[in-house]
Structure formats: C-alpha cells, structure tokens
Design a protein with these regions (language model features):
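Short beta-strand element of the alpha/beta-hydrolase
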Residues: 81-90
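Alpha/beta-hydrolase active-site loop signature
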Residues: 91, 119-123, 197, 273
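Primarily recognizes the serine-hydrolase "nucleophile elbow" in alpha/beta-hydrolase
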Residues: 141-205
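The feature captures the conserved acid-bearing segment of alpha/beta-hydrolase catalytic domains
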Residues: 183-184, 189-203, 215-252
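C-terminal catalytic histidine-bearing segment of alpha/beta-hydrolase fold enzymes
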Residues: 247, 251, 258-300
Length: 300
C-alpha cells in the first residue's frame, strides 16, 4: 500500500492550510505514518501485562453509572503520595486501561498511585466526543474526591495522556468544573504526548466519518483556544517520525503555551513514530519517563 503524501490535482480545492481533502485525510490517518503500528501496539499490550505482573492487582472502581465507567487504581503503600492519572489514546475509538499500564510498575516503585480510566469508544455513543470528555472529567473528579481514602495526595495529581488521550487530558484544563463543585480543575501538572489540540482540521478530515463534530464541540474541545488556563507545569512530547499534522499541532500548542506560561517544556523524541513514543514509557530512563518525573518534581 502506498502511504506517501498524495499529490494535489489541479482540480482539487484546498480544504485546510492549502491541503486538499485527500492530503488532510492522509495526514490524520496514522496508518500512513507508522507502518509497524500493529506490531508496536502488540508490544505495548505485552509490556502492560509485564508491568501489571510486577504489581498487586489494581482496585477496579466505578466512577459512573455505565458499565464501561470503571477505572484501575494501582494503590501505593506510601502515605499521601502523588497520583498519575493516565488517559489512553486510540483515535477516540479504541484502547483499554488494562492495555495501557506499561508505566505503572516504575511509577509504583517510586511510591506513586496510578489511575487509568476506561471510557466509551466514540463510535459507541453516536460520535459524541463531548460524552468522552465528560467521562474522563467524571473519572478525574472521582479520583480527586477519593484520594484521601486511598492514601493519595489530592494536591499532587499529574494527568498524562497519549494521542487522543492527550487531547482529552488537555481538555480537562479548559473544561468548566463549577457544575461539579470545584472552582477549577484538580490537576497539579500535565503531560501530553502526540496529541491534537485544535479540532478544526480534524473535523474536516476523514475522522468526521465517526466523530459527529459540531462548531460548538470544536470550540469547546480545542485546548489551543484556551491556553490562558494552563497555569500548572506542562510537558509536551512528540516523535520526529509523526504525521506532519501531529508535528504542527505539537509545535503550535507549545509555542502558544510558552508565550503565556513559563512552566512549559517541549520535548522532541528522535527516531520514533506515534506509537513507538508511547512504548518508550515502559522504560523509566526514557525521555518520556524523565519528562514525567521532572513534572512531578516541578509540581510540588
């Protein structure tokens, strides 16, 4: 299969930043930018299983009424310790908490709690991406409210996300929390890896075949449009073998945040694609892991 960038035909109009529809669809389809994606995803699931084998069974807790609204909580024995809340990716339509625990072993060894929520696939909720954002928000609220019960420090919640999970993680900063009883989000630090932060181009791409984008959703769920809210330490990561659109999104979000907030770092990871960069999180000395450790120290 030819995965190279389609050449624009004279008859094709530009859809976004000079890209034709075919070029935009190509840019937002990870199959075109990571030929080894199936193998790497299998490795991520395998390493998650290895990580879980090194740990006590997590608590399986309900944060909502729906059967999918459950989370895995790897409890630390260290009192009043930090908590890492990880939001998995999967183009908003795949992924599980169980298969995204590859970082849990070394975080647990450091004395951290690790929480990984499950939530709906957008294709199972009529393309309603706002529903997923509400689920992740409810999972984070539940985690915050029960920190003391499980020995975690509610003032040290570090939210981490990859791909579409990075998008949802960043949305947690810009969402309204007042209706949930909080004046603002409970996030002490944020790490976003290989995410999307402006939904306009995504809404024009083939992803609109399974996400029911509306102008209101694009406005509400585009963290790029709410950079004034990112006052906590933030780390952004991107692999240099990513899709050009994911690279552009990383660069523009980084630049926008750095103009307003001094506690923002950005990290290029050499030689890795969209999926390989997540796999590196298994190793506690990887750039990905070191960025997370630095965030945890900076958020004190």
């Amino acid at each position: 299969m030819d995965t190279s960038r389609p050449e624009a035909l004279d008859s094709e109009p530009g859809v976004y930043k000079g890209m034709t529809q075919r070029q935009l669809d190509w840019a937002y389809d990870q199959a075109n930018h990571a030929a080894n994606r199936v193998q790497v995803l299998e490795q991520i699931a395998h390493k998650s299983a290895l990580s879980r084998q090194l740990l006590p069974e997590p608590l399986r807790l309900s944060y909502g009424r729906e059967p999918i609204e459950m989370l895995d909580w790897y409890v630390s024995e260290k009192a009043h310790s930090p908590l890492v809340f990880f939001v998995h990716g999967g183009a908003w339509k795949s992924g599980t908490a169980q298969n995204n625990a590859l970082q849990a072993h070394w975080l647990h060894q450091m004395g951290c709690h690790v929480v990984i929520p499950d939530f709906d696939a957008v294709s199972d909720v009529d393309g309603n991406l706002s529903h997923l954002a509400r689920q992740v928000q409810n999972a984070l609220l539940y985690t915050y409210q029960t920190c003391a019960k499980h020995g975690a420090n509610p003032q040290k919640i570090i939210v981490v996300g990859h791909s579409s999970g990075a998008h949802l993680s960043a949305c947690m900063v810009t969402r309204d929390w007042r209706g949930l009883g909080l004046q603002e989000h409970p996030i002490s630090a944020l790490l976003c890896c290989s995410g999307m932060y402006e939904l306009e181009p995504v809404s024009l791409s083939a992803r609109s075949q399974y996400v029911r984008f509306t102008p209101e959703m694009v406005q509400d769920l585009s963290p790029q449009r709410g950079t004034e809210h990112f006052k906590m330490p933030v780390a952004l990561l991107c692999g240099d073998q990513e899709s050009p659109e994911f690279i552009r999104q990383f660069q523009e979000f980084s630049e926008s945040l750095k103009l307003k907030h001094p506690r923002v770092t950005s990290h290029w990871v050499q030689g890795v694609n969209h999926f390989e960069i997540l796999e590196t999180l298994f190793e506690p000395d990887s750039i990905h892991a070191r960025a997370l450790k630095a965030l945890m120290e900076d958020s004190i």
